[in-house]
Amino acid sequence: MSEIRTLGEFIVAKQHDFPHASGELSSLIGSIKLAAKIVNREINKAGLVDITGASGEENIQGEQQQKLDVYANDKFKAALEARDQVCGVASEEEDEAVAFNKELNQNAKYVVLMDPLDGSSNIDVNVSVGTIFSIYRRISPIGTPATEEDFLQPGHKQVAAGYIIYGSSTMLVYTTGNGVHGFTYDPSLGVFCLSHENMQVPKDGNIYSINEGNYIRFPEGIKQYLKFCQESKPEDNRPYTSRYIGSLVADFHRNLLKGGIYLYPSTQAYPNGKLRLLYECNPMAMLIEEAGGKATDGEQRILDIKPSELHQRVPFFVGSTNMVDKVHAFLDEWRD
């Protein structure tokens, strides 16, 4: 039997990657791990208790909040505030960033941005959902409340990013800039165990993930790329396979393991794209680049975009390097 390495043990062993770290980042990820266990427990019994469905409230984007969105947001926020490594949190579910006011929190080095429950509308049909998180070092002075500028940093400033996928098994996948590592939750032991070390996305793939129901509203370059994907060319492994779950974490996770591309382009309804730069695109972009892939908005690298507002949206193309490059070629050829 091979040695079991838990998430906590792995993080401690990797602390030498941060010569100036004193354990705060490791403890911060421990807070995320704790909240993930709590949310996972609630998701697993969602069909048995009155926690699925709409809460009756809307978030800043005008989207109907699900009850579990609110629950997950509260649990992650509470777990992060309870320890002294985080001075503030920005969430897709909150209009503004939240600065933690306790003195210990104001002395913290980090801020966290999160989508507490991505794909939550799928819960009542038992489809995988997830949590996405992003960690930055604050730029405001230590000992003062966090400011909005702490959160409006380009993605290449992230010190860590990751996601938790709640599915047939629950996994936590994260990077601190030294590889992408996945941990599977063992409910009998109550721990996340290392199951996927140094994850790498294949340079090529044959899976494309896009909501083809929006086809008539896509830019011409995307329409032409989809035709390319569907053409029969056995010599270069086409036609490709269409796989779209409607949960970013689930689609991303599959493509990371098998090779593929996830596309959410601009549409007539969402000319700037629909996905949030800070809560979804930046953390996934850091992960995919660490795994050897690419992430762009169709024109530039996602991690180079300087955000102008907390809930900024962008088009998003992420996955295997050669597939992202091919999308760019079509967008360039058919650009207005």
Curated annotation (Swiss-Prot):
Pfam family name, one: FBPase_C
Species of origin: Aliivibrio fischeri (strain MJ11) (Vibrio fischeri)
Catalytic reaction annotation: beta-D-fructose 1,6-bisphosphate + H2O = beta-D-fructose 6-phosphate + phosphate
Protein name: Fructose-1,6-bisphosphatase class 1
Biological process annotations from GO: fructose 1,6-bisphosphate metabolic process; fructose 6-phosphate metabolic process; fructose metabolic process; gluconeogenesis; sucrose biosynthetic process
Enzyme class: hydrolase
Keyword Ribonucleoprotein part of the UniProt annotation: no
Pathway(s) of this molecule: Carbohydrate biosynthesis; gluconeogenesis
Family designation: Belongs to the FBPase class 1 family.
Superkingdom: Bacteria
EC number annotated for this UniProt entry: 3.1.3.11
Cellular component terms (Gene Ontology): cytosol
Cofactor note: Binds 2 magnesium ions per subunit.
InterPro entries, alphabetized: FBPase_C_dom, FBPase_class-1, FBPase_N, FBPtase, Fructose_bisphosphatase_AS
Any GO molecular function: magnesium ion binding
NCBIfam families documented for this protein: PRK09293.1-1, PRK09293.1-3
SUPFAM superfamilies named in the record: Carbohydrate phosphatase (SSF56655)
Residues at which Mg(2+) 2 binds: 115, 118, 280
Needed co-factor(s): Mg(2+)
Compartments, record wording: Cytoplasm
Amino-acid positions noted as binding substrate in the UniProt annotation, renumbered to this chain: 118-121, 211, 244, 262-264, 274
Binding site for Mg(2+) 1: 92, 115, 117
Subunit structure: Homotetramer.
